[in-house]
Every structure is written in C-alpha cells, then in structure tokens.
Amino acid sequence: MIEQIYQIVKLNFRLEWQERQSYFSILIYILSSVYLSYLVFSEVISAETWNAFFWVIFIFSAVQAAYRSFHYEADQRFLLYYGMVKPENLVLGKIIYNFLYLYATGLFTALVFTFLMGNEINSLGAFLFILLLASLGFSAILTFVAGISAKASNNPALPAILSIPLLYPQLISLSRVSLRSLTGFSWEVNAPLLIVLALLSLVSLLLSFLLFPYLWRD
C-alpha cells in the first residue's frame, strides 16, 4: 500500500514536471493577483484585508491546481489504472500530492504577499500550522471533486461549482483563526478552533477515502 502510494505521488510529480506550464500558470496567477492588490491598496492595507485577500487568492489557485488531479487518468486510462492500482491507494496518493502542491502554493502566496504588501504575520508558527490544515482539507475535497469532474469528461465548470460550497465551512473557520495569527495569537485560546479545523480536514480525508472507490467503479 505504502509503495503504491509513493509511486503515485512520484508519478504525478514527474508527469506535471513534463508539462511545466501548469506550475507556471499558478505562479503567474498568484503574482498577478497579489500585484494587482498591491496597486489597488498602494501599500496601505490592514491585517483584515491582508488576510481576506490571501485566502481568496489561495482558494482559487487551489481549485485551479487540483483540477488537473485526474488529467492523466481520464477516459480509457481509467480502465488501465483500475486493473493496476487499488482506488484507495490512488486517491490517497493524489491527496498527498495535492497537499504538497497546495502547501507550497500557500507558502509562495504568503511570501509574495509579505514582499509586496508588508509582513502582517504576528505568529509565524501558528500561520504555517493553519496553512497546513487548510492544505490538507482543501486537497482532500478538491481531489474528490476532480475525480467527479474526470468521470464527467473533465467538465471545467464542475470543480468550481462543487468545491466552493464544500470548502466554505473550512474557509470561514480558517479566515477567522488565521486573522488571529496576524493580530496576536494564543495557542491556549485558539486550541478548540484548531481542533475543529483538524477534525474537518480529517473528515474530508475519510470521506474521500471511503467514497472514491464507488466513483471509481462507476
């Protein structure tokens, strides 16, 4: 199981690196969005605005990045993978790959924000931990949605239509607790909310793991 998951993650990195334009398109989107925000606010930006713009840019870049999760397994290749890999291993490998991808994307977005808009992060450790939880929860939901989209002939509208409502509960909680990491963070006070976020990410992961085999056999 572990070997199969590792090979799936490795294969995804190799395939995506062969088509580097997907990586570069995400980087260009982040750079252009943050730079536009910089021009609009002319360096005068509050912590609340910094936080809101960060999550808006991150969630849309995450949707765009995860859309390609099953780009290489669509159509007839689903039958080939069905005979070679267990669906549970496949979805876990995809989720791990997307988690690493999204976490790197979030770090790059925060770095660009800090460079252009100023460093508003008061507690770096808390912010990085919150971003990790966000990447895990987003990757689980978006990977499953990408699988549905692949089964529907890679309809480009489905990921945005399905994922935004599913991500909304996590996004609201994330934006609130991440704002506290900008203005002043206490681990003791925010521990219950962090536990809720961790449980939401875990539930998203378990649902993707349990439901994907049924989608795979369809």
Place the predicted regions along the sequence by residue.
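Transmembrane helix boundary and interhelical loop/hinge segments in multi-pass membrane proteins
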Residues: E16, V63-Y81
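Membrane-interfacial helix-loop-helix connectors in multipass membrane proteins
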Residues: S42-I45, L111-I130, S178-L194
